[in-house]
């Protein structure tokens, strides 16, 4: 009996070792999956980024059904890069990109953020060369920003 209890205890302690670690949040996965199903066309204007983008009703604000929100709250540069394919496949007319502030809150270096934004820009330019890209500045922050943990 003692051996069975020890065996079960050992198995229970080992379970976390086998659990697959998630790369992104459930919210990210839900939004990214939704965006894969929503078509992008060459007439579209895409707002791409994090919660600042996610939190606005862009089509209503501009009264234009071709304006599409592709923001995900909490997103980081590599999150945007990982979900670019359905966007560039549609070869949109314009992309407004605002990303990087959540990388700052996670302690990512400025050089790494610049490198990852450059990867995003290169992919857009290579796969959708006629798309006009509007790169928006990462918002300035002070030392207390880390307390928000975007």
Model regions: which residues?
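Bacterial Sec-dependent N-terminal signal peptides
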Residues: 1-21
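Short coil/turn segments at secondary-structure boundaries
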Residues: 3, 71, 108-111
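Serine-esterase "nucleophile elbow" of acetyl-processing enzymes
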Residues: 19-94
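Alpha-helical cap/lid subdomain in secreted, periplasmic
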Residues: 60-62, 66, 82-150
């Amino acid at each position: 009996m003692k051996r069975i209890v020890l065996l079960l205890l050992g198995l229970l302690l080992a379970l976390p070792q086998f659990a697959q670690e998630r790369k992104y949040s459930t919210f990210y996965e839900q939004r990214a999956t939704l965006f894969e199903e929503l078509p992008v066309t060459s007439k579209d204007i895409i707002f791409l980024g994090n919660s600042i983008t996610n939190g606005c009703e862009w089509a209503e604000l501009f009264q234009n059904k071709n304006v599409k929100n592709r923001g995900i709250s909490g997103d980081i540069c590599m999150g945007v890069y990982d979900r670019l394919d359905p966007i560039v496949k549609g070869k949109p007319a314009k992309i407004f990109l605002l990303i990087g502030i959540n990388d700052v809150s996670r302690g990512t270096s400025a050089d790494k953020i610049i490198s990852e934004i450059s990867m995003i820009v290169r992919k857009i330019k290579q796969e959708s060369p006629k798309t006009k890209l509007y790169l928006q500045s990462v918002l300035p922050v002070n030392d207390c920003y880390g307390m928000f943990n975007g």
